Amino acid sequence: MSDKKRINQIAKETGLSNTELVATAQSLGFEVKSHSSSVTAEQAEKIIQGVKTGTDTIVNLLKKLLKLKLRLVPETAKSKQEDHPRTFAGKAVVEDPAILARIKEKEEAKKAAKTEAEPIEEVITTEKPKVAEPVKKSEPKAAAKAEETKVEKVEAKANTVTPKAEVKTENVADKKEPVVTEEKKKSLTQKPRIQIKVIKRAEDIKKEQAAARPEKKKFDKNRNDRNNRNDNRRPNQNGNGQGHSQGGNHYDKNRPAGQGQNQGQKRDKFASSGSSSTSDTFTPAASGKNNRRDRDRKKTDSNRDNTKDGNRKGGPLRVNDNRNQVRNARNSNWNQKGGRGRYQNNQSSNVPATQRKFHELPESLEYEVGMNVQDIAKSIKREPAEIIKKLFMMGTMVNQNQSLDEDTIELILMDYGVTPLKKVEEDKSDIERLFVEDGYLNEDKMVERPAVVTIMGHVDHGKTTLLDRFRESRVTEGEAGGITQHIGAYQIKTNGKKITFLDTPGHEAFTSMRARGASVTDITILVVAADDGVMPQTIEAINHSKAAGVPIIVAINKLDKPGANPQRVTQELTEHGVFPVAWDPENGSEFVEISAKFNQNLEDLLDTVLLVAEVQELKADPSVRAIGTVVEARLDQGKGAIATLLVQQGTLHIQDPIVVGNTYGRVRTMTNDLGRRIKEAGPSTPIELTGLSDVPQAGDHFAVFEDEKAARAAGEERAKRAQLIKRQNTRRVNLDNLFDTLKEGQTKSVNIIIKADVQGSAEALAASLQKIEVEGVKVDIVHSAVGAISESDISLAAASNAIIIGFNVRPTGLAREQAAQEEVDIRLHSIIYKVIEEVETAMHGMLDPEFKEEIIGEAIVRETFNVSKVGTIAGFMVIRGKVTRDASVRVIREGVVIHDGAIASLKHFKDDVKEVGNAQEGGLMVEDFNDVEIDDTFEVYKMVEIERKK
């Protein structure tokens, strides 16, 4: 056995990782299960050689792949160059005859395509011959492509021609052709073909316009004469209302209203002439604007001539004439469908109204209960009026801002053919889900985090001294009597890696965290004094660690003491289920012998912690919003609520909105374990925080929210739920309600914690209780120890829902207060058979006495008075029964019980009284409750003892 080595020792000597050594050893067929397994020297050499050989093989393989890649790169590049030859000065640099033949075939194909296109050009261009020349052989490939693109663009223009292009082509046709170079001949020869066709159509339009003008002038002249004879006062009676509706144009003030009919006829002619081509569209606003202005000027001149022929003065008559035209134009606009705008264009009546853009309906829609019509219309891209109309046809009258129920929303969506999907509302106040789910974490951003280590052990076994040596500070000297007075969290750095330590007095925080489902500890260091051995709190620490499921590292301390015996400590620990790795390689614990006082083997202990942490592969994502657990909390008179937090995921920053347990706030200050202020804290970092609205409890979770509004809403919601749960919470198991709980099937075993004055009494009591036989029920001894009932016993009983039996011992003052707060049942006895009889009687449901609640009075709060240093006094009026000083009271607000407690004081006017009768006024204070408001109801009751039926 002396020549054997453990895997972790080989890793230290060679610098290789434990994982590689274990994997290589297993591949070689050696019996190796973990880094703690032992191998012979010969096997160790084979394992090291195997790891190095594997590494060299991988390196050689990579080198071969790199060489092969370098050989393949030139061939690939060469093939790409052959497929796409480079061109210099318009000539393709190609030497391969196959590629030359391919280029030749492409040029011949282009020639054939141009030859096929020539007959089309002859049909369109009847006046000019074809000028295009075939592509020469010496012409480069790029030039041929450019020529082909130009020809395609010109042919595309032949199909769609705008009226603006028609006017331009008329001017181009009249001019002489300029002298062009050979490069531009092809593009110029294509244009006249299209221009000749368009010019013919433009000439036809001009002839039609010229033919229509004389009739129009004659009609205008007769119309003006008739209007002047009627003195401009009679409405137009010529029966051409349609002409009015189309001819009323306020741009042309001197134009008669009856001209609209002829104008409409001309528009029809335009449409008929333009309909010869299916693809061309004529736009009157573009081509006839200038001509219309010329015609208007001629009309004005003709009106002046008419005035002279009538032998009347020009001034007044022109005014009347203009007024008549304006009046007729206004009348025509009344009949026009397009509206009566002042600058309405008469040609716009033929333009169709712009239709609303059509939006396709979504396949499905995720809706919320309470959505209104406007929200649904916006989601499915429809008008609210359309949805309101549908609902009206279904028999439901709503407006667009009215909230709809679930059935109505689904009915509307199904009517449109949209699948309704109810939105699952996420409970943002439930921060506990963040500790169970990890879907919000980014796997690519996960980094290694420091291990969180809890130091546990018996009193005065050297826990704080050990942590003091780790931190290289003098924490122990500052504590009263050398005993830890508070829970601390500290961080140290060793071998380039950080370790976070939790120092716990009596392990309350550890048990409290486990009771609330929090798991913050990764590793437990169990400190045992080599001279004292295993003590009661040592066994308690072992039970806590196993219940939490964290690995244990045993540190046998005080080797410098004369009576130190590490072998005896190891033997005693094995009796409680803690075995060394040498004895149990799979489930064993690491044992390290140290002396914290003389700094002996502390480096080995830290290396062991890092080794266990490496095996666990602890990782966290620092990029998300921070979550973590409360280690300690207290109320400071100057700073307010102060909480010691441990960040588990993400990064916590100053001014972050945060929810801690049932309270909320904004991070005001953050202090690290050295008392220095910091601006951010990453994973596994302990910090002390201020800025909370109330003091949280140890073990509560915290989470950072996106803004303060969301944090406030979540905190208030959590506080409301906690208060509701507290009211509805069933009573803890005690001897009074044990039988009822057993009948309801809520308990299959009775958990008991035994504390006695001597070890023999504790063992005898445990054996006697386990012999009690009740059908379907068994007694489970959670913990048995010697000494007074402490706070740690109360915490353990609260976590395991156990009953504490004290035999010849009493609870401490703090333990008694905590038991009342945690509602833990404590039974104190000095005779064993009475303990057995009481437990057996409780299990059979025959425990006396039994109490019944009796309501004796009811009162309503009329006024409240806040007295400094005293509290809130409620002035009340008794409406039924009476209020007595020795009774209990429930505070009811809006039908909900918000507090249940005793009456602290009772007064009638200024006198202290024992009771206040019906229809009388008085004042009272409720014990430990000051949130009394006007109109609250006091329900006064007493617990009356009754005899239990046997």
Curated annotation (Swiss-Prot):
GO terms for molecular function: GTP binding; GTPase activity; translation initiation factor activity. Residues 448-619 form the tr-type G domain. Residues 503-506 are annotated as: G3. Residues 128-352 are annotated as: Disordered. Belongs to the TRAFAC class translation factor GTPase superfamily. Classic translation factor GTPase family. IF-2 subfamily. Residues 457-464 are annotated as: G1. Gene3D superfamilies: 1.10.10.2480, P-loop containing nucleotide triphosphate hydrolases (3.40.50.300), Translation factors (2.40.30.10), Translation initiation factor IF- 2, domain 3 (3.40.50.10050). One of the essential components for the initiation of protein synthesis. Protects formylmethionyl-tRNA from spontaneous hydrolysis and promotes its binding to the 30S ribosomal subunits. Also involved in the hydrolysis of GTP during the formation of the 70S ribosomal complex. It comes from Lactococcus lactis subsp. cremoris. GTP binds at residues 457-464, 503-507, 557-560. This is Translation initiation factor IF-2. It comes from the Bacteria. GO terms for cellular component: cytosol. Keywords: Cytoplasm, GTP-binding, Initiation factor, Nucleotide-binding, Protein biosynthesis. Its main location: cytoplasm. Signal peptide: none annotated. It is found in: Cytoplasm. InterPro entries: EF-G-like_DII, IF2_II, IF2_N, P-loop_NTPase, Small_GTP-bd, T_Tr_GTP-bd_dom, TF_IF2_bacterial-like, TIF_IF2. The keyword GTP-binding applies. Residues 557-560 are annotated as: G4. Residues 595-597 are annotated as: G5. Residues 322-336, 343-352 have a biased composition (Polar residues). Residues 128-156, 165-186, 200-234, 291-312 have a biased composition (Basic and acidic residues). Disulfide bonds: none annotated. Residues 482-486 are annotated as: G2.
